Every structure is written in C-alpha cells, then in structure tokens.
C-alpha cells in the first residue's frame, strides 16, 4: 500500500511502479555515489514493486490543480494494466485555494501577480476530489464504501477556525497567508473502500480487500472507535481479508507537519513559494518550521507496545489490542504471530511478518524533519493486517497459506529523489497462495 501524498509526484510514482529504467533516469543524479548500500536497497525495492498484484492508495487526487487536474488512480491503473475502484473521501472547497471565490493579495505587486496565477483554478477541469483506491490484477467484485464514525468535522471546524482568524483580528497579508495555508476546508470524512477479488486458491474463491484511512485530527480513542465500527462491518466475511491503509497512529490528536508540507499540498508551484515565504514564518528563515510544540515530536515507532501511563504512554495500544482479540464469525483472526523465519532481515515480535520491523520498533512510514534540527520524529502510520486461516492470533503452528510474509517498508526507494517521492514510503507484503513448508511456521515472539 502507498499513501501517495495526493499524487504530487505522479511521474515518479508511475515510473517506480512500472518502469525501473525511467525511474533510475529520473533519480540517478540525486543519489550520492558513495551511498552504495542505500542505492542497492532502493534497487531491490524497485524490482519488488514490479511484481505487485494488488495496490492500495491513500490520498489520491482526482481533478485538483495541485496535481494538474489528473485522475491519479486512473493514471496508475492504466500504467499497471490493473482494475481499480476509487472511493471519495473529501471534496475540497477552500474558497481561496480551490474555488477562487475569495482572494488574498500580497503587498509586493510582482509576488501578488504570481500568486494570483498560481491560485487560479480552471473551473472546467476542477473536480476537487480526494480519496482512497484499490488497484488489482484480479477482477473486483462487490465494491462498497463504509463511512467511518466522524472524529473530526473538517468543514465545520476548519470554517470556524478561519472565521475566528479573519474576524477576530486585523491580519497582514503575509500573516493571513500563513494562517490560511494551515487550514483545509473540505466536505466529507474518513472511510474504508471494500472489494472482493476472485482468487481460485481461496476455499471461498475470493479474498476481501479493505483500504482504510483513519482520522489524524482526533484522539487515539476515536481512531479505535473507527476501527471498531469497521471490524463490526467486516465480521461476517468468511474470505481471507487484507486490511491496509494509513491508520494515523501518531499517539496524539494530530499528525506533525511543516509549513513546507502545507504549501506543497495547496499551491502548484510550491518550490517558489517555500523559498519566498521562509521569512514570513520565522525570522531565522527555516523552511520547515514546525506547526506544533517541540515536545510533541519524539520517536514513536511502535504503537503496538505496551501502555504504561507516565512511564510509557501508548494511547494507540487499545486499537491493536482490539485488532488482535477480534474474531470473525467463522472463528478466524488477524495474524499477529510475528514469525522470524519469514522476515528479511529476520525480525520477530508482534506483526513482524506483515509490517517491517527494525532493531527497535517498526520501520517508520512517516518522518517529520526540520532543516535546522534534522529529523524530529518518526512514526509508524501505515499498516497491513491480514486475516488468513488462523484461529489464534499468536500460535505459531498454524497454516501459512494467505498469511503475510516478508514485509518491506521502502524507505530507500522513496528517498531516491532528493525531495522524496511521497511523505510516506510504499509498504509491501507477500501472501503465499499455497501452504509453505512446516519448518517456516515455528519461531514467534511477542
């Protein structure tokens, strides 16, 4: 699965998925010659991407100016020769950045002219859609959308914040630009896209794919409510189930970001405006100025770890407890075995066979960085969880057919370009359609 950050780098994404030669041509000048290990890992990951049969996308645009009005999902599905389904999560309706029903002006006439050009939206091309997709080499059946419980009202809450900003004080144009760039005015909410695929090797002849995107602007407790509602919807399914997506497991009520990232997702020519607006946000000129207090950013690599208030506060743990203890009506469970023998490099512990681990915690799938202080926090936000034919989430000696094996978090591939492909790397897992040798079933740890 891959959170593609709206498809801002669609050419690189497409090349990574379909054309290694083109990808290397696009990125070769960005890779330091001395970093041979990084390059070798990226090459291995690039090769692995060429063999995918199923792809889940989060944050895929359709008809947005920031992504040249492309249909990101259709573009990638065509390049991959895959079937696809797309579910709309949000309709973007910001009056300045999306609809052009309001204006913002800068005192410098040349900057203002360029800003108006960059903000202008072609109404004939604009659809304003943002969502989640499933792409598959297998035919898709019974496609449906399940709307998750609302944990954050994006339109009402953001509109109220904008109103208080603009009505409560007198703002300079630069200050107003900064405050508005941090807001996302849109209709809609988090959802899961669900589809069945035809798989002859499955006893039911099918597998069920669930592409989910949980809320970032809420507490971990509300994310657990969203997961609980989703699993209740899936409870009667007798097929193998692949549940994947951005669960936004930050441990807090928001995802860390930067002014740079916010400008990237709002204005097409973001590189120019990042350079121009550095001094507007910080007198020292840091392009990646944090929008959150410094104490918020800490290494948060294992949301499955034990929760010990004060000593080790892990408010995401209840969500994973619920996933582990969940039973489908057919008695099956999600696979939490974490078997060392089917991971590369060998790692054992919770979910190690479906989500790549490192020496401590999981390999992060989202990193927040500042130019003046390096990486501030690393987070494991994106997940793949699989229901194979297990009746106990931890017991080792159970079938490996349809069970997750050899997970990869493709950090090296994602960082091959100097400015990375997406703010999330792709993550993959192998699912064997036939039973694996008995010797691979052993060895699991909590």
Task: Annotate each language-model stretch with its function.
Residues 7-8, 62-65, 92-95, 153, ...:
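Active-site environment of divalent metal-dependent phosphoester hydrolases
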Residues 140-145, 220-221, 228, 234-242, ...:
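Metal-dependent phosphoester-hydrolase catalytic domains
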Residues 1-132, 148, 158, 162-183, ...:
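N-terminal, active-site-proximal structural segment of metallo-dependent hydrolase catalytic domains
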Residues 2, 58, 212, 244-247:
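Active-site flanking residues adjacent to catalytic metal/cofactor-binding acidic residues
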Residues 143-190, 195-228, 253, 445:
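Metal-dependent phosphoester/phosphodiester hydrolase catalytic core
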Residues 132-134, 192-196, 211, 382-384, ...:
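Conserved hydrophobic/aromatic beta-strand scaffold that supports enzyme active sites
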Residues 69-72, 224-230:
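Charged helix-capping and loop-helix junction motifs
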């Amino acid at each position: 699965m891959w959170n593609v950050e709206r498809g801002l780098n669609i050419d690189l994404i497409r090349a990574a998925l379909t054309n290694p030669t083109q990808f290397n041509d696009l990125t070769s000048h960005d890779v330091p010659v001395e970093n041979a290990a990084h390059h070798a890992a990226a090459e291995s990951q690039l090769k692995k991407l060429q063999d995918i049969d199923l792809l889940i996308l989060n944050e895929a645009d359709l008809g947005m100016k920031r992504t040249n009005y492309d249909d990101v999902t259709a573009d990638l599905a065509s390049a991959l020769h895959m079937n696809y389904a797309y579910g709309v999560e949000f309709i973007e309706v910001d009056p300045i950045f999306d609809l052009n029903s309001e204006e913002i002006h800068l005192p410098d006439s040349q900057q203002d002219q360029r800003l108006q050009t960059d903000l202008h939206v072609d109404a004939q091309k604009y659809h304003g859609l943002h969502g989640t997709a499933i792409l598959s080499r297998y035919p898709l059946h019974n496609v449906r959308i399940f709307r998750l419980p609302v944990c954050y009202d994006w339109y009402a809450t953001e509109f109220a914040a904008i109103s208080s900003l603009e009505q409560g004080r007198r703002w300079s144009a630069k200050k107003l630009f900064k405050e508005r760039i941090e807001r996302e005015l849109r209709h809609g909410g988090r959802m899961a896209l669900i589809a069945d695929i035809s798989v002859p090797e499955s006893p039911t002849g099918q597998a069920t794919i669930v592409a989910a995107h949980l809320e970032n602007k809420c507490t971990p407790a509300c994310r657990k409510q969203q997961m609980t509602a989703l699993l209740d919807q899936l409870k009667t399914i007798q097929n193998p189930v692949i549940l994947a997506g951005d669960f936004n497991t930050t441990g807090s009520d928001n995802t860390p970001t930067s002014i740079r990232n916010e400008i990237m997702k709002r204005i097409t020519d973001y590189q120019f405006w990042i350079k121009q607006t550095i001094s507007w946000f910080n007198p020292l000129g840091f392009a990646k100025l944090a929008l959150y207090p410094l104490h918020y950013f800490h290494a948060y690599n294992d949301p499955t770890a034990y929760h010990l208030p004060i000593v080790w506060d892990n408010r995401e743990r209840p969500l994973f407890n619920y996933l582990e203890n969940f039973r489908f009506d057919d008695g099956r469970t999600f696979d939490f075995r974490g078997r060392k023998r089917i991971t590369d490099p060998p790692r054992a512990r919770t979910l190690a066979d479906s989500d790549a681990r490192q020496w401590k915690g999981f390999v992060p799938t989202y990193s927040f960085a500042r130019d003046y202080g390096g990486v501030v926090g690393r987070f494991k936000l994106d997940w793949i969880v699989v229901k194979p034919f297990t009746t106990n989430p931890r017991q080792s000696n159970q079938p490996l057919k349809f069970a997750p094996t050899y997970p990869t978090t493709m950090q090296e591939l994602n960082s091959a370009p100097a400015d990375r492909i997406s703010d999330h790397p792709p993550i993959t897992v192998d699912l064997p359609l036939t039973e694996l040798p008995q010797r691979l079933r052993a060895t699991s740890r909590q």
